[in-house]
């Protein structure tokens, strides 16, 4: 009996897991014996290095990034956030009287019919479903009626999928720029040495808030009804850097974007750069619904617009772009340096400064084709039969998988639900050129000094005496 207890104690001791890597001596010995039996070396007892080899070659899943979303058990916080959108917000209590503080009148805002949009997408077999569409509409209503935010308009942009959690993105426009501070901002990234790559290209300024790529502000949350976070304005450097990398989102705004070339910011900045690119390429509207005001440059809605039939909405000619094109500079409006008086415009400006992109209200049929002469948009229908009277039609983007637009009657919408990865081949950048050891301009001369002539033999003899 004592022998059995001693064996059990020995096994228990060998099965104790290390706090560093989580392995045990028992598991290591099992792998070591399996390695020796598999290779069958001649002098197995002399190969003491096999133990170290087995330990070094063992795969550790903790060291690599997950390839699939990590299942997260729902907690009480997500449940409370989901329940909160179905009721009125809780009012603060006045400590003097013990009564709730009177609520401010709700803010007036503009928004699309999100329930009708969810029904259109549900008919086309895309989107997030009608049940989640109700929650999205209630969350957008909560944002729009908040008197502290004081938004002028709110629109559900879409949902970005992440490895640990997802992002629900709402596109808002504030009545006053100062009201933007009411929404908590995403934490600023920590500056890492060597993050900014040296480049001889001129620095491109950031577009002002309310213009170009920063015309709208984006609020994100991991669960509908949860706390909102305001994404920072996008910079041209971030847009250009995001075009050179492919990275899955983690669902954590403060995560470091570890890529080559280095991205100037954290995941909040990377998500904002993706939104700017996707918005410029996939936010569309039915043709003839808007007209461009030549004086103000803004879009005006037509009052006498007649929606086409459902299946006709599945044609690229039935949709137009309503967001300005994002140029190679990372801006919607090309920035040009000040031209010297004696300089030639064609020789002084580079290709990015001379770029001319498509104008507003350009039809989707004019979009660049994919390799193999494949169209950038493919049609989708609510029914394969043309005999069905009331149908919904739309288009699915092949450039940005997950971006769709659709309409049925007077109801239309466009939304993005995807991983934030563009359908384009990944072309890694070559390493940068070898840096110079020092600046040649600071060197006084590049010529070596001549060796002084040796003294005459007579002078050497006198010196010896």
Swiss-Prot record:
It is found in: Cytoplasm, Cytoskeleton, Flagellum axoneme. Its main location: cytoplasm. One of its GO terms (cellular component) is motile cilium. Keywords: Cell projection, Cilium, Cilium biogenesis/degradation, Cytoplasm, Cytoskeleton, Flagellum. One of its GO terms (biological process) is cilium movement involved in cell motility. Transmembrane segments: none annotated. Residues 184-209, 445-465 are annotated as: Disordered. Pfam families: Radial_spoke. The radial spoke head is made of five different polypeptides (RSP1, RSP4, RSP6, RSP9, and RSP10). Belongs to the flagellar radial spoke RSP4/6 family. Flagellar radial spokes contribute to the regulation of dynein arm activity and thus the pattern of flagellar bending. They consist of a thin stalk, which is attached to the a subfiber of the outer doublet microtubule, and a bulbous head, which is attached to the stalk and appears to interact with the projections from the central pair of microtubules. This is Flagellar radial spoke protein 4. The lineage of its organism: Eukaryota, Viridiplantae, Chlorophyta, core chlorophytes, Chlorophyceae. The gene is RSP4.
């Amino acid at each position: 009996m004592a022998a059995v207890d001693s064996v059990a104690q020995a096994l228990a001791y060998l099965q104790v897991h290390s706090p560093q890597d989580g392995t045990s001596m028992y598991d290591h010995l099992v792998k070591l014996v399996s390695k020796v039996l598999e290779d069958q070396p001649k002098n197995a007892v002399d190969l003491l290095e096999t133990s170290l080899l087995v330990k070094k070659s063992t795969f550790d899943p903790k060291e690599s990034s997950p390839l699939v979303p990590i299942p997260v058990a729902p907690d009480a916080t997500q449940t409370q956030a989901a329940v909160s959108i179905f009721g009125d917000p809780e009012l603060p209590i006045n400590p003097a009287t013990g009564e709730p503080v009177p609520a401010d009148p709700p803010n007036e805002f503009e928004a699309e019919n999100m329930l009708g949009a969810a029904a259109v997408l549900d008919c086309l077999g895309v989107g997030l479903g009608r049940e989640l569409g109700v929650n999205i509409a209630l969350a957008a209503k909560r944002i729009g009626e908040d008197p502290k935010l004081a938004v002028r308009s709110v629109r559900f942009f879409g949902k970005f999928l992440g490895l640990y959690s997802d992002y629900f993105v709402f596109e808002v426009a504030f009545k006053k720029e100062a009201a933007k501070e009411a929404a908590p901002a995403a934490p600023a990234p920590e500056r890492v040495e060597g993050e900014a790559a040296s480049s001889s290209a001129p620095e491109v300024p950031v577009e002002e808030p309310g213009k170009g790529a920063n015309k709208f502000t984006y609020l994100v949350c991991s669960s509908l009804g949860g706390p909102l976070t305001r994404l920072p304005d996008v910079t041209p450097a971030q847009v250009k850097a995001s075009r050179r990398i492919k990275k899955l989102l983690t669902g954590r705004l403060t995560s470091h974007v570890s890529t080559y070339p280095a991205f100037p910011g954290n995941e909040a900045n990377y998500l904002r750069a993706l939104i700017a690119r996707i918005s410029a390429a996939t936010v569309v509207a039915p043709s003839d619904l808007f007209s461009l005001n030549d004086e103000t440059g803004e879009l005006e809605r037509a009052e006498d617009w007649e929606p086409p039939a459902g299946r006709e909405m599945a044609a690229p000619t039935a949709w137009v772009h309503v967001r300005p094109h994002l140029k190679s500079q990372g801006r919607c409006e090309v920035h040009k340096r000040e031209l010297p008086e004696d300089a030639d415009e064609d020789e002084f400006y580079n290709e990015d400064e001379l770029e001319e992109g498509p104008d507003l209200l350009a039809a989707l049929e004019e979009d660049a084709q994919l390799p193999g002469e494949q169209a950038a948009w493919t049609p989708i229908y609510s029914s394969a039969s043309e005999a069905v009277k009331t149908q919904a039609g739309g288009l699915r983007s092949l450039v940005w998988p997950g971006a769709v637009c659709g309409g049925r009657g007077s109801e239309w919408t466009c939304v993005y639900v995807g991983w934030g990865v563009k359908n384009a081949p990944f072309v890694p950048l070559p390493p940068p050129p070898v840096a110079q050891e020092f600046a040649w301009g600071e060197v006084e001369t590049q010529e070596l000094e001549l060796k002084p002539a040796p003294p005459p033999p007579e002078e050497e003899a006198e010196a010896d005496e």
